[in-house]
Amino acid sequence: MTPGAAGRASFGQSAASASSLKWAALQDAAKVVAGLAGLEPERTTPEIRNFPALIRDTAPWRRELAERGIDDMAAVMEPGIAALLGVNARGADPRAAALTLWREFTHARAAVLALLPPSGAMGPRRSA
């Protein structure tokens, strides 16, 4: 364990694995929200699917911001989905609230994805 930014501990590979799991869980949660909003299922782009691996190879400041963004998205999505499921269970229409949560999520996800450096026509930079 090494000290991270702002007094947070950085656990190296295990932190990357935890972020990867959170990222995948967020994408699954987004599918639920989209369904409750009445939207068609979103196609997962390579950028979204490969984000954890791509961000792992970037500068530490990008990884730290991505981890914070992922944590922030989870902090919004968890209670949001719980509320939407509660509304749906009572027989009320959750579409308007779900659409609002969906838009909030997609904007936050776009901001996190923007942390990836440009990859160019040859794909992301790789180093041995």
What are these model-derived regions, one by one?
Residues 16-26, 41, 45-48, 67, ...:
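Alpha-solenoid helical-repeat scaffolds
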Residues 31-86:
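Amphipathic alpha-helical interaction modules
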Residues 1-55, 106-109:
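Short terminal alpha-helical segments
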Residues 2, 37-40, 51, 59, ...:
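Intrinsic-disorder/low-complexity coil detector
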